[in-house]
Amino acid sequence: MAKKSLIQREKKRQKLEQKYHLIRQSLKKKIRSKVSPLSLSEKTKMREKLQSLPRNSAPTRLHRRCFLTGRPRANYRHFGLSGHVLREMVYECLLPGATRSSW
């Protein structure tokens, strides 16, 4: 089981990412726009605004975690579980439609 502080830190990052998502997205669109090209000085100002946002608001800082154990590795997106928990739940028939492989 992951430490509670790490799980809380990840939740805090998710909230920050949601809060600044639209701001970050609009700044990136303005920098990349080819319809109305910006001058070099305007682009640098936009980049400075982008860099002034909190680091933890960037989506690359997020990490998927198992919602039962908080484990950050070997997560299956479809289930939101780590491989260990997924395997145990399949063996106990707690996931409908998932079966053990046999050949």
Curated annotation (Swiss-Prot):
Residues 34-56 are annotated as: Disordered. The lineage of its organism: Eukaryota, Viridiplantae, Streptophyta, Embryophyta, Tracheophyta. One of its GO terms (cellular component) is chloroplast. This is Small ribosomal subunit protein uS14c. GO terms for biological process: translation. Binds 16S rRNA, required for the assembly of 30S particles. Disulfide bonds: none annotated. Part of the 30S ribosomal subunit. Keywords: Chloroplast, Plastid, Ribonucleoprotein, Ribosomal protein, RNA-binding, rRNA-binding. Belongs to the universal ribosomal protein uS14 family. The keyword rRNA-binding applies. PANTHER family: 30S RIBOSOMAL PROTEIN S14, SMALL RIBOSOMAL SUBUNIT PROTEIN US14M. It is found in: Plastid, Chloroplast. Its main location: plastid. Transmembrane segments: none annotated. It comes from the Eukaryota. One of its GO terms (molecular function) is structural constituent of ribosome. It comes from Triticum aestivum. InterPro entries: Ribosomal_uS14, Ribosomal_uS14_bac/plastid, Ribosomal_uS14_CS. The keyword RNA-binding applies. It holds the Pfam family Ribosomal_S14.
